[in-house]
UniProtKB/Swiss-Prot annotation:
Any single biological process term in GO: translation
Keywords: Ribonucleoprotein, Ribosomal protein
Source taxon at top rank: Bacteria
A Pfam family this chain is assigned to: Ribosomal_L34
Protein family per UniProt: Belongs to the bacterial ribosomal protein bL34 family.
Protein name: Large ribosomal subunit protein bL34
Length: 44
């Protein structure tokens, strides 16, 4: 049986990347929440 997670950087960036997050209001909310929490990595 094939495992569910087959990592690839392109789709990863396209769905969870910084620019994608900044594109929507809710995405910006995610980034700000992670900033407030003090995350080292804000997006992928």
């Amino acid at each position: 049986m094939k495992r569910t997670y087959q990592p690839h950087n392109t789709p990863r960036k396209r769905t969870h990347g910084f620019r994608v997050r900044m594109a929507t209001k809710n995405g910006r909310r995610v980034i700000n929440a992670r900033r407030a929490k003090g995350r080292k990595r804000l997006a992928v």
